């Protein structure tokens, strides 16, 4: 590989390509003379669209092929939406940079209704996320929640075709694709606690690739990294994938991290919530201790039931 070339492995969805170009532009601005090439790929998550994610292996489906490209030295970095990044990495790879976070909230999108509370009973709401589903069902048990897969454009088309009365998407994705006008309401964390890392872009590379790690250092956003570290530590302790309804959101307020989290039964019948406040340097430990609290307060049983197997120890 030429010293002045860096290769980015990326999925081919419009949002994934936006993220890859975002990282490419940042790298070239920080390192004049660097040539950045995109290596587009198709992942299993892009191909299996007729089955809910939870049933086909979860969000790791979107990153595995990219990681193989890194391990086989066909690419130098992989760019991910942080909410799609599993808690564990293949040996030799790791998350080395987290870019500045976009708006982390969920978006209520509808052609006929202004907000969630305006939906009549029996309305059909589309979401592919058990996390969104459980919070929706708790707040509005009178709604019908149906699975919704595909990229952002596909999901909006299904709404426009009348298959749904409303759908829930990420604010960040809509903004990045220039579709902010489709957002009827951004749902505050009190109504829909975001996914771990939602709105942040993460960069994975080979851990022994010193040159690439040095190039990426300029893109790391310290505050976002602290917040996402707390969220991911909690998720790791819960052994959370996207197959279970887990929400986690950290804010940095007056120099202190405020971490909120929940674990819920998919039907919204039971949601265990908790929060922690503490010093930024304790971000990881805060996440772990909050996870322990949730497990002890009933999350262990919910997770065991959802996984149909062993609960986290």
Curated annotation (Swiss-Prot):
It is an enzyme of class 2 (transferase). Keywords: Porphyrin biosynthesis, Transferase. SUPFAM superfamilies: Periplasmic binding protein-like II (SSF53850), Porphobilinogen deaminase (hydroxymethylbilane synthase), C-terminal domain (SSF54782). GO terms for biological process: protoporphyrinogen IX biosynthetic process. One of its GO terms (cellular component) is cytoplasm. It holds the Pfam family Porphobil_deamC. Disulfide bonds: none annotated. The modification S-(dipyrrolylmethanemethyl)cysteine is found at residue 242. Its EC number is 2.5.1.61. InterPro entries: HemC, Porphobilin_deaminase_cofac_BS, Porphobilin_deaminase_N, Porphobilinogen_deaminase_C, Porphobilinogen_deaminase_C_sf. Pathway: Porphyrin-containing compound metabolism; protoporphyrin-IX biosynthesis; coproporphyrinogen-III from 5-aminolevulinate: step 2/4. Binds 1 dipyrromethane group covalently. GO terms for molecular function: hydroxymethylbilane synthase activity. Its cofactor is dipyrromethane. It catalyses: 4 porphobilinogen + H2O = hydroxymethylbilane + 4 NH4(+). Monomer. Belongs to the HMBS family. Tetrapolymerization of the monopyrrole PBG into the hydroxymethylbilane pre-uroporphyrinogen in several discrete steps. The porphobilinogen subunits are added to the dipyrromethane group. This is Porphobilinogen deaminase. It comes from Escherichia coli O7:K1 (strain IAI39 / ExPEC).
